[in-house]
Amino acid sequence: MELVFLGTGAGLPSKTRNVSAVALNMTQEINEVWLFDCGEATQHQILHTNLKPRKITKIFITHLHGDHIYGLPGFLSSRSFQSGENQPLCIYGPIGIKEFVESTLRLSQTNLTYPITIKEITEDGNLFETNEMMVETKKLQHGIDSYGYRIKEKDKPGELLVDKLKQIGIAPGPIYQQIKENEITTLDNGSIIYRNDVLGPAKKGKVISILGDTRYSIDHIPFIKFSDILVHESTFTQDKELLAFEYNHSTNVQAAKLAKEANINKLYLTHVSSRYQAEDIDSIIEEARKIFPSTWLANDFSVYEI
């Protein structure tokens, strides 16, 4: 599992940062890629990575500002020609995302070659759940409806205790897989094996919290608490805290403070204003690390293993 940052700029593209988009690559786990926001030219950014558009099965839009959605029509259209035929895709987002997508496709006379589902978010809580994953959402504090997403990978069974099985006379073979897949297994001799008796500790699933544009708020702490990864906007540096509040954004230090208060493992800053140039990057990171040492500032095409 890895995070691939496709766009890390705020508001408008710059020479070094495109507008917002980040992919959660889970091809090794569930053979899917999930995309969070889709700013203008996201499909161009994808071309510079190993991500396959047909593997993108879900797109989560945090809010409807243009730097987070203007890349959707182009990506959806191109996916039809990139082995995406008949590969379903679901889009989640605030009220209005359905009208935006359907209107742009209709007016441009774009006919997709795959089924698309659009689900609008109307309340906080559980968005959906599968056998492997669970996604929750929470409204944040921005000028328009903006949401955060908490992605929870479910715990996986521990490793089969092979030595223990051998000790009780069960030789390696297909029976091992049967034991691992079933709570109770009856052997040919009538013996009963309980899976929990021959498995090691469960492998704890990862938790990734990705927040859309927002002001700093302690109300977000319960939603993101104990996440392995927090992706948080860092539009301004701390000397611009009042400006951040006025424009419904956050500073690098505020993001670090939130990560510390919520017992996050790693913080990745993104959504950086174009006012900050290459020579400012070190100070942005240093300011945040004084509060929360496990902080990184994402760049376009940064890839982080989870």
UniProtKB/Swiss-Prot annotation:
Keyword match Nucleus: no
Active site per the UniProt annotation: D67 (proton acceptor)
Transmembrane helix keyword on record: no
EC number(s) reported in the record: 3.1.26.11
Pfam families xref list: Lactamase_B
UniProt entry keywords in alphabetical sequence: Endonuclease, Hydrolase, Metal-binding, Nuclease, tRNA processing, Zinc
Cofactor: Zn(2+)
SUPFAM superfamilies: Metallo-hydrolase/oxidoreductase (SSF56281)
Highest taxon of source: Bacteria
Binding positions (Zn(2+) 2): D67, H68, D213, H271
InterPro entries membership: Metallo-B-lactamas, RibonucZ/Hydroxyglut_hydro, RNase_Z/BN
Catalyses which reaction(s): Endonucleolytic cleavage of RNA, removing extra 3' nucleotides from tRNA precursor, generating 3' termini of tRNAs. A 3'-hydroxy group is left at the tRNA terminus and a 5'-phosphoryl group is left at the trailer molecule
GO MF annotations in UniProt: 3'-tRNA processing endoribonuclease activity; zinc ion binding
Binding site residues for Zn(2+) 1: H63, H65, H142, D213
Free-text comment on the cofactor: Binds 2 Zn(2+) ions.
Assembly and oligomerization: Homodimer.
Purpose: Zinc phosphodiesterase, which displays some tRNA 3'-processing endonuclease activity. Probably involved in tRNA maturation, by removing a 3'-trailer from precursor tRNA.
Recorded family membership: Belongs to the RNase Z family.
Name the record gives this protein: Ribonuclease Z
